[in-house]
A protein has these predicted regions:
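Glycine-rich, acidic/polar active-site loops that bind/position phosphate-bearing ligands
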Residues: 102-318
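Histidine/acidic residue-rich metal-binding segments in metalloenzymes
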Residues: 1-76, 80-98
Length: 318
């Protein structure tokens, strides 16, 4: 894309300025060429409805132009907005079932990625009348409000501050269960947790699992997972045994909050798929077993000025 188009996108990310259709067409063409070079055949508006997961609908780049010819096409209109059936997604009671129309709209602050053969474009998801039907829309509004309020305060101490960014690092704790054993438990397969059964023969009383040597089979899973994450731009950093038996943790390098949330949503999907390759079932439920620690997702967050000051870092005289 041209330098002017690149600057327009960066201004949209940094300052919330609007992107006109001419620039959107350039961005879409660049995305298409890049994605096709990575083996992509389809694109999707990747969003986070109120289901606790992600959603996507794949459309092919393929588009007929005459009776006997076709091209690979992806326009600015297709990038910026898509229409989706919103009637079958949870909405918190804010709309009627017959109000089916919903819209996904491009979030330029979260980079697109190629997952398999699909170009995934992070988007918000809203109703025809503008209500948020996802988790990203209220997050973006909250980040904007925090930026405005925190910048006003920070400028009392440093007139050079023009923006305050919320950063986030999500600790992803999880249990790994052998697939052969998990499939014998309907409660695990249906609910992702145990609902009946006897206490385990060994718990966490000796604290010998926490930060212990990682079992070789689990380590092979972690290595495979990290490779997949790096290909998708997820900056994984730390891996270790957690407190409970067969409980582990993966932590990324912290980043801008909106992007960190998107990466964590993608991470959980990747973890499930890689677990299948290693004959594991991964459990994310907060309390899958009685009598031992559950899994948390600690949100380590802070506020950072555009002058490089971490506002939550303790001073020499806290």
């Amino acid at each position: 894309m041209t330098r002017d188009a690149f600057d327009a996108v960066m201004n949209a990310i940094e300052y919330g300025t609007k992107i006109d259709r001419r620039v959107a067409d350039q961005v879409a063409a660049s995305m298409r060429d890049w994605a096709i070079s990575k083996g992509a055949t389809h694109y999707t508006h990747w969003f986070q409805p109120l289901t606790g997961g992600t959603a996507e609908k794949h459309d092919a780049f393929f588009e007929p132009v005459t009776r006997d010819s076709a091209i690979e096409r992806f326009s600015g209109n297709q990038l910026v907005q898509q229409e989706s059936d919103a009637s079958s997604f949870p909405n918190g009671g804010i709309r009627n079932t017959f109000e089916a129309r919903g819209y996904t709209a491009w979030d330029p602050s979260s980079p697109p990625f190629v997952y398999g053969t699909v170009l995934c474009i992070p988007t918000i998801f809203i109703a025809y009348t503008g209500e948020a039907l996802d988790n990203k829309t209220p997050l973006l509004k909250a980040l904007s409000a925090i930026d405005q309020a925190a910048t006003e305060v920070a400028r009392y101490f440093d007139k050079n501050v023009s923006k305050v960014t919320c950063t986030l690092g999500c600790e992803q704790e999880y249990f790994l269960i052998d697939r052969t054993l998990a499939t014998t438990r309907p409660d695990l397969m249906i609910t992702g947790r145990t609902l009946l059964g006897h206490e385990a023969a060994k718990g966490q009383q000796l604290d010998d699992h926490y930060l212990g040597a990682i079992p070789s089979r689990v380590l092979a899973y972690m290595r495979d997972l990290e490779q997949e994450c790096l290909l998708l731009g997820i900056p994984v950093k730390t891996r270790h045994n957690e407190v409970a038996p067969n409980q582990f943790e993966l932590a990324p390098i912290f980043g801008e909050a909106n992007l960190a949330v998107d990466q964590n949503s993608l991470l959980m999907d990747v973890m499930r798929k890689v677990a299948e390759r290693h004959d594991f079932v991964v459990l994310f439920h907060e309390k899958p077993f009685a009598g031992v620690n559950g899994s948390g997702k600690h949100n380590n967050w802070s506020l950072v000025t555009d002058t490089g000051v971490n506002l939550f870092a303790p001073s020499k005289t806290p």
